[in-house]
From Swiss-Prot:
Its EC number is 1.18.1.2. Homodimer. InterPro entries: FAD/NAD-bd_sf, FAD/NAD-binding_dom, Fd--NADP_Rdtase_type_2, Ferredoxin-NADP_redctase_2. FAD binds at D34, Q42, Y47, L87, F119, D279, T320. It is an enzyme of class 1 (oxidoreductase). Coiled coil: none annotated. Keywords: FAD, Flavoprotein, NADP, Oxidoreductase. This is Ferredoxin--NADP reductase. Belongs to the ferredoxin--NADP reductase type 2 family.
Length: 322
């Protein structure tokens, strides 16, 4: 017979992991379902060595350190974890039935913490770019790029942050953006301008050259100009953001705003017993930060527990009193 859980969480990224931990503090029986082969979400898989600067009480920590800390926090509790499972359907009711690519699950309440859904890097759209093994979309071991010539493409937080990280160990670091202004946090952009990183704007990549499976140079055209630019490198890093897919989200019967799940101040969706937190949810004024999602997790858990036990207060004891 299928076991029925108090709270099932869809998504094993930072927000989902913290929601699971907090649910255990409320003595809930918890399950996590994630489509990836490991827990941790984007920070663990796509930028394990990238510094994250907006987690309270941590001046800086990497994606892997954040994941390790969250897993250590969760470790003392008995959490059922299902990996490589993708949610395909939700059947609401007193007991909610979840259908995945591997079977069915039953739960009393559901917290969706799936981020932007399945994700993959936006590719460098140059013929043959995927044939070179030194064209990268994420960093798994930054020390292997010490004393190398590095070129970074992009203008957002990842591109700027990685450029600043490479500056500390690389022989040379250059960043190229298609616009004059960067989209990264103002403090990071100012730090970039004060660094030894060479900045080229606004340029659009046009071609790669190399041999034996390794690229050695990239050509650019300057926007609204006849100027050309060619840069040689040992490694090229593409930071154009990510494409995400929400799969069958539209078929789950939840109110959506574009591709996000509409929630109220209790993190409740339009379906009783189902909550959404993190980047997958929408409300007016929503800010997409890990820190924001971490704050939404206790709200969802406490209201889920109140849904299960209407006579109990939504506001629980503080952890300092446990």
């Amino acid at each position: 017979m299928t076991q029925v859980y108090d709270i099932t969480i869809i998504g094993g990224g930072p927000v989902g992991l913290f929601a699971a931990f907090y649910a255990h503090l409320r003595q809930a029986k918890v399950k996590i379902i994630d489509s990836l082969p490991q827990l941790g979400g984007q920070p663990a898989i796509l930028y394990p060595e990238k510094a994250i600067l907006d987690i309270p009480a941590f001046p800086s920590l990497t994606g892997q350190e954040l994941t390790d800390n969250l897993l250590a926090q969760l470790a003392p509790f008995d959490t059922t974890i299902c990996l490589n499972e993708t949610l395909t359907a939700i059947e609401p009711g007193e007991t909610i039935t979840l259908t995945t690519n591997k079977g069915n699950h039953q739960t009393k309440t559901l917290i969706i913490a799936m981020g932007g859904g399945a994700f993959k890097p936006r590719p460098l759209e140059i013929d043959g770019a995927d044939s070179f093994d030194n064209v990268h979309y994420h960093v798994s071991n930054i020390q292997q790029y010490a004393d190398k010539d590095i070129v970074v493409l992009g203008g957002g937080d990842s591109a700027v942050d990685w450029s600043l990280a490479f500056e500390k160990i690389a022989k040379t670091t250059q960043i190229i953006h298609r616009r004059d202004n960067f989209r990264a946090l103002e403090h990071s952009v100012e730090e970039l301008k004060q660094s030894s990183v060479t900045i080229h704007t606004p340029f659009i990549p046009k071609g790669l050259s190399g041999e034996n499976g390794r690229a050695s140079a990239i050509d650019f055209d300057k926007v609204k100009s006849e100027d050309k630019l060619t840069l040689s490198f040992d490694h090229l890093f593409v930071n154009y953001g990510f494409k995400s897919s929400v799969g069958t989200l539209k078929e789950w019967g939840l109110e959506l705003n574009r591709h996000r799940i509409v929630v109220n101040s209790k993190q409740e969706t339009s379906v009783p017993g189902i909550y959404a937190i993190g980047d997958c949810c929408f409300y007016e004024g929503k800010i997409d930060l890990i820190a924001t999602g971490l704050g939404e997790a206790p709200t969802a858990v406490n209201n889920a527990m109140n849904y299960l036990n209407p006579n109990e207060k939504v506001q629980p004891k503080h952890s300092t009193s446990l």
